[in-house]
Amino acid sequence: MEQKKRSSFSSRIGFVLAAAGSAVGLGNLWRFPYLAARYGGGIFLLVYLILALTFGFSLMITEIAIGRKTRLSCIGAYKALDKRFGFLGWLAAFVPFIITPYYCVIGGWVMKYLFTFISGNALEAADNGGFFSNFIGYDAGSLSSTIFSLNGPTPWFILFVLATTIVVIFGVEKGIEKASRIMMPILAILAVVIAIYSLTIPGAMQGLKYYILPDFSQFSVSTVLGAMGQMFYSMSLAMGIMITYGSYMQKENLLEHSVTQIEIFDTLFAFVAGLMIIPAVIAFNGGDPSQVNSGPGLMFITLPMVFDSMKFGTIIGAVFFLLVLFAALTSSISLMETLVSVLMDKAHMKRKTATIAITASCLIIGMLSCLGYGPWATITIIGMQFLDFFDFISNSVLMPIVALLTCILIGHVVGTKVIADEVKEGAGSFHREKLHRVMVRWVAPVMLAAILASELATKVFHLFTI
């Protein structure tokens, strides 16, 4: 009965756009350009492309096939494959439970910056970090005044959560698929427009050469680990999203072809994000690629200053933050949908009830990250603010563990033939079956263990050196 009642995307392109929208997020915009600049530009791009076509493809098609085969959310899907791995479904579901609240907080920051640029106050945002620090660290003296002030992050966080909720509550076809069909083409067009404009800035060609041309002398193990980590996080793997979206995929759709389209879109967007950002930032900093920083510092401090130095910078900045808003929304929608799907499957809730429940929990938990740089800044967990801690636990610990255990389950317990048979059901063939078998059984587990060890070693080293 569950399979008959389960919602589905109306077409393959609807599924591809929704899944690509999940993959295309803030990581593409603020982490990929930084890593490309740090690890030699062109050589990083080359390594990233190779890994996306092998490592990323194998993990993504595995998760989507699991979802389509079982027609269940991640908790039920893993248990359906092997009852001993039922715990893995809960672990996978816990990842978006942690990520969704703080991701919506950052989405609220984006809304604030978009409003700032649209209202003609872009100069305020270009003050080398002062505007950003005052905004996320806003403290009006009393908690109620801080929460309800537009000068602080909380109202913007709430607004972003509600925007995400509205899409999810309408369901798969009328909500997620329809929103993806609108936002993804606009996202692509805006990215190309900004990239083209960025390349017209005086001095941008030097940054373009650094970004495009491979320098093999800069190739190292760190380059591979950096590209592997970015590709892993970028593709929305190991958080139940692709399993959930796979469960909405129609059986007659070509699974391998769809995954190829998703990875092409995600990789192209990451590449264009680099074109938007790296040449402009390098030109702004007099040709120094080391000044391309990562995370919020790049998006909310460096780029507003770059826009301020441009002709028509206010307009370009507004267009950029609109692009970022769409990218953040398509990702937050997939995160929330994963949790809603779990409640619908396990607690037998109706979509509306499940969405309201997840929204409420998101607002409550997200308040920790929202106020973690302001009134609650003195409260830390192992030396980290709430948002940084949630990001570390989800991205650096849980996601590699979930992906590693998934590879063990598929590669050494139930067998890769389970995935291959599901892929062939819609197409009759699986062109990269041998690659998939080798990657999932042997190569991917080693890579994932390396990512986990690298992240933990970096954090432990940091803790003992502060």
PLM feature spans:
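Transmembrane helix-boundary motif of multi-pass solute transporters/channels
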Residues: S11-L51, G246, H257-T260, I264-T267, ...
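Loop-to-transmembrane helix boundary motifs in multi-pass membrane proteins
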Residues: S8, G14, T154, F265-F271, ...
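Membrane-embedded translocation segments of transport machinery
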Residues: E2-F9, I13, E177, R181-L329, ...
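Extracellular loop-to-transmembrane helix junctions
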Residues: A36-T62, L88, G152, L398-P400
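Transmembrane alpha-helical segments of multi-pass small-molecule transport proteins
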Residues: G14-F15, A19-A20, L49, W90-A93, ...
